Design a protein with these regions (language model features):
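N-terminal signal peptide c-region/cleavage motif recognized by signal peptidases
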Residues: 17-22
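Extracytoplasmic "Venus flytrap"
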Residues: 31-52, 74-80, 103, 168-176, ...
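Short, polar/charged alpha-helical segment
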Residues: 40-65, 181-187
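Extracytoplasmic ligand/sensor domains, especially the bilobed periplasmic-binding protein
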Residues: 96-194, 245-263, 267
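Extracellular/periplasmic periplasmic-binding protein-like sensory domains
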Residues: 234-308, 367, 371-374
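Segments of small-molecule ligand-sensing domains
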Residues: 293-311, 318-374
Length: 375
């Protein structure tokens, strides 16, 4: 059996040598500030592992554009204040050319609000939230947006005649925009949100929300929640006798749910996925990922959708570095990102100035009675 142990991100001393402007090829430092402990630690570590797998492949092949890659990461525990502090620290200490793999509605909102990205002229490539984010400079998504996920779920429900829906989501700064988007999308599919409930941002306190759905039962509930909140909701809702079909957005993390909940509780749960499955060979990207995992000893965590997403983010960074050429700078890297148009083999990522959402890929995974995942 493969063992999963912490991997070591070396070359930190070399990492600190990369200035914002480098005349010639260099080792490029990528910094991740993410929940490596706390409620969402499994996903944060999996994303990190995916980034590292991509960078390892590139380094073994001689780099990209003459550059090799080093990943430096810091733990924010899912706390927005720590996200800002750790980002400020890693920018000063390690001089990264890009950031990657950030998590959480409030953490990313605070990062954007802080002005750090504009001040440092540094891109964030790849992040996970449960809200609909506006397109802003320096923030690049390598996955489909939450609007795409909601549309996929709503269209599927409409095709099977389910029109009375519940909405469960985090009560944060983006809640108003989120609910407006859900109302717009469901109206187009002929559905109606008949019950709404929230949970406090940054927590997994779901009991009040469950009471609302038990009192006003919808046919299906759309869960726009973190993995820990979604797991708590599913568990308590089923124990309370809730019978609605449950649909979650990709951030709910199907592996975390399966680890916490039994097969009977998980049966019939559907989750929108924004990457190809890491568990089956469905194209060149999936095969490359599977082969890389098989050849990598001592992975920190088991393969997962979050790891696949980190791998995609890593490959996107590598492609931007290739396009940037030998003279490395944050400004040149951002300019190169805006030209990225790449087919990874079953998954396309593309950006251009003013369009920083790089993918529209969404498919639904459903957990069967045997606890298996099928698309």
């Amino acid at each position: 059996m493969k063992k999963y142990m912490p991997f070591i991100h070396g070359a930190v001393a070399v990492a600190a040598s990369l200035a914002v402007q480098v005349a010639g090829a260099a080792q490029l430092v990528i910094a991740q500030v993410a929940p490596l402990s706390g409620l969402e630690a499994i996903q944060g570590r999996a994303y990190s592992a995916g980034l590292q797998l991509a960078f390892n492949n590139a380094n073994k092949a001689g780099g990209a554009g003459g550059h090799t890659f080093s990943l430096v990461r810091k733990d924010d525990g899912g706390r927005p204040d720590d996200t800002i502090a750790a980002t400020t620290q890693v920018l000063a200490e390690s001089k990264p050319i890009a950031l990657a793999g950030y998590f959480g509605n409030r953490s990313i909102a605070e990062l954007v609000k802080s002005g750090i990205l504009e001040k440092e002229k540094i891109a964030l490539v790849g992040y996970r939230t449960t809200e609909i984010r506006p397109d802003v400079p320096y923030v690049y998504s390598v996955r489909a947006g939450l609007r795409d996920e909601i549309t996929k779920i709503a269209e599927h429900l409409a095709t099977v005649g389910i029109t009375r829906l519940g909405l469960f989501h985090e009560d944060g700064p983006g809640a108003a925009a989120l609910t407006a988007a859900v109302d717009e999308i469901t109206k187009k599919t002929g559905s109606t949100i008949t019950a709404r409930a929230t949970y406090p941002a940054g927590t997994a306190r779901v009991s009040p929300a469950i009471d609302i759905f038990l009192k006003t039962p919808p046919q299906a509930i759309i869960m726009l929640a973190t993995g820990s909140a979604a797991a708590g909701f599913i568990e308590q809702y089923r124990l309370g006798g809730g019978a609605a079909q449950l649909f979650a957005q990709s951030g709910a993390d199907i592996e975390q749910l399966a680890q916490r909940l039994g097969e009977e509780t998980m049966q019939g749960i559907a989750i929108a996925q924004v990457t190809p499955s890491p568990y089956k060979i469905s194209g060149r990207l999936a095969k490359e990922f599977a082969d890389t995992v098989a050849k990598t000893p001592n992975l920190e965590v088991p393969p997962s959708y979050a790891m696949m997403e980190g791998y995609i983010a890593g490959k996107t960074i590598i492609e931007a570095a290739r396009r940037m050429g030998a003279k490395a700078s944050r400004e040149a890297f951002v300019a190169a990102l805006d030209t990225v148009e790449t087919d990874m083999g079953g998954y396309r990522v593309g950006f251009k100035p003013g369009m920083r959402s790089g993918s529209r890929f969404v498919e639904l995974s459903i957990v069967t009675g045997a606890g298996k995942i099928r698309q």
